[in-house]
Design a protein with these regions (language model features):
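Bacterial Sec-dependent N-terminal signal peptides
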Residues: 1-21
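Accessory carbohydrate-binding/adhesion or oligomerization-edge regions at the termini
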Residues: 20-119, 202-230
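Generic structural detector for well-ordered beta-strands
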Residues: 52, 57-60, 142-144, 189-191
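Short structured motifs
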Residues: 123-127, 138-140, 183-187
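Short beta-strands within extracellular/lumenal beta-sheet-rich domains
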Residues: 133-144
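Non-cytosolic beta-sheet module surface loops
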Residues: 145, 154-158, 203-205
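Aromatic-lined ligand-binding clefts that engage carbohydrates, nucleic acids, or primary amines
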Residues: 150-165, 199
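Beta-strand-rich ligand-recognition modules
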Residues: 166-214
């Protein structure tokens, strides 16, 4: 019995790696992207009841083949997520429908509201009939504050590894082959400044599902809700 289980696991791994190499698209997409996302409206959003940010501008996946996720060390992530794949990667404020070129790929940004607290990147990719293994997802959101909010922490869960920048500064790194768990990692204390704050994230995965969740936690461990999301 154990041999059969090991054989089945090996076969599944082989299929996953072959799918990644060949950049298979999904034959049976399963649930529609509409089950997970709605187009963002012009009106600013707010965090949900638990403080999770659901409005994001997501870039269609960038091709980044990896046979497995054990390579996602701190140094690997800083090198491969810190490099520029498209012009203005760390400076532009992307708009819905805007297009960029990453290598030979022409990719489009989509501004969406997630129906779940965790943003289902895998379903975002399959719903658009895009590559879903061996990829990097870029996510950007704009946070508006009426006043400085000091002493908060950026709290993230991601599948698999990810890296996050607030207002251009590296704020949090989630390395290794990991599952998405809410509040899996938290940053040092930071300040959400009065006015506009820009949060950028990059999520990388080889074979496997991809998603993330983000919120800010104050010094008392309470989710920050007095912000607007654009």
């Amino acid at each position: 019995m154990n041999k059969l289980i090991l054989l089945a696991f090996a076969l599944m791994s082989t299929v996953a790696m072959h799918a990644q190499r060949e950049k298979w698209k999904v034959a049976d997409k399963g649930p529609s992207i509409d089950n997970y996302f709605t187009p963002a409206t012009a009106e600013a959003a707010t965090p949900d009841n638990e403080g999770f940010i659901r409005r994001w501008t997501l870039l269609e996946p960038i091709d980044k083949p990896n046979r497995g996720n054990t390579v996602f060390t701190d140094s690997y992530l800083r090198e491969n997520l810190g490099m520029e794949y498209f012009k203005g990667q760390f400076s532009i404020l992307p708009k819905n429908g805007q297009k960029v070129k990453a290598g030979k790929q022409k990719l489009q940004w989509h501004t969406l509201d997630s129906k779940l607290y965790n943003v289902k990147l895998f379903r975002f990719a399959t719903g658009l009939d895009k590559q879903f293994y061996g990829i990097i997802f870029w996510a950007v959101t704009v946070i508006e504050c009426d006043e400085d909010i000091p002493g908060v922490r950026l709290s993230v869960g991601s599948n698999s590894a990810s890296m996050w920048w607030l207002n251009g500064n590296e704020t949090l790194l989630l390395s290794g082959d990991r599952r998405m768990v809410a509040d899996d990692c938290m940053s040092q204390r930071i300040t959400l400044k009065k006015g506009t704050n820009i949060l950028r994230g990059a999520v990388i995965n080889g074979p496997g599902m991809s998603d993330f969740c983000v919120r800010f936690i104050d010094e008392n461990g309470t989710p920050v809700k007095n912000i607007r999301i654009k």
